[in-house]
Amino acid sequence: EISLRRLVKEALRMRPDRLIIGEVREAEALDLLLAMNSGLSSMCTLHANSAREAVIKICTLPLLAGENVSSDFVVPTVASAIDLVVHLDLDRDGRRTVREVAALSGRVENGVIETSDVFHRDHSGNLVRGAGAPSGAERFGRAGHDLAALLSSHSDNSKGAY
């Protein structure tokens, strides 16, 4: 049997431009977090009930890697390595829809990562813009994206699946 943790390490040896992990459930979260912290564009999925709970979970999973990994290391690393958390929900028709998008500011206060609401569903089910935004607009610019334009262009109050 080949563990996901080993596959993540082997993938990093290939010097990829991006690393995408289908589902993070255990100690492989540490290796993914280290890759993200080194500047490698990465994405993963995990199961949680909200964007905030996903942040808590991604802070907890690396602790499964061993006794020498502490939350004093993991929490600030998550805060600096992850920009956005997109929470999907399953609607009545079985479609996945964006429920909320949260931005991580990079700041930690009393062991809690500061997040802000970028998008959320209102009481009518419309996806609406929150007050938050991801930090590091210059990185989006270097990649050819105008962050302000991307965030302001969402005006369709979409109820659709993504």
Go through each PLM region and give its residues.
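Conserved P-loop NTPase nucleotide-binding/switch module
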Residues: 11-109
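Short Gly/charged-rich anion-binding patches and loops
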Residues: 6, 30, 132-135
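Nucleotide-state-sensitive switch-loop elements of NTP-binding domains
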Residues: 1-10
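Residue-level detector of solvent-exposed, low-hydrophobicity positions
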Residues: 9, 19, 53, 76, ...
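NTP-binding/hydrolysis catalytic cores, primarily Walker-type P-loop NTPases
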Residues: 93-162
